[in-house]
Amino acid sequence: MKETLINIAKAYVGESQARNRYTFYAKIAKKEGYEQIAEIFLTTAEQEKTHAKRLFEHIQELKANDEELKIEVSVPAVYGTTAENLKAAIAGETYETTEMYPTFSKKALEEGYEVLGKRLAAMAIAEKNHKEKYENLLKNLEEGTTFI
């Protein structure tokens, strides 16, 4: 089995987890009175769902017929205040931007998956946008300039 298939499965699981965490984080932000942050968590969750769907489609293209993929994954378990959740989201998006997607893109290209390699590189850019958005929200929250 090619390494790219395993990488895509890991990315799919990561995006699926992020989507769920962000919906959980949105509820906390809303409960704490941060409507803007809650909305951005929800919007980003939908974007992560789109990423997961595309990755799942790539799994279908690369896997054998009834193949079940077994992978090892980490589960980020931060579930705290809005500030703590933003920090956790920033850490996750930073990993995807600086390590995961660049590494997966390079491997896909090495294995001859040019379109997939380019798509993974593009996903790194999208994740960088998420990271920057969360960094700005955290900065505003820490400075007390967040809309409530």
Where do the protein language model's features map onto the residues?
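Non-heme di-metal
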Residues: 1-148
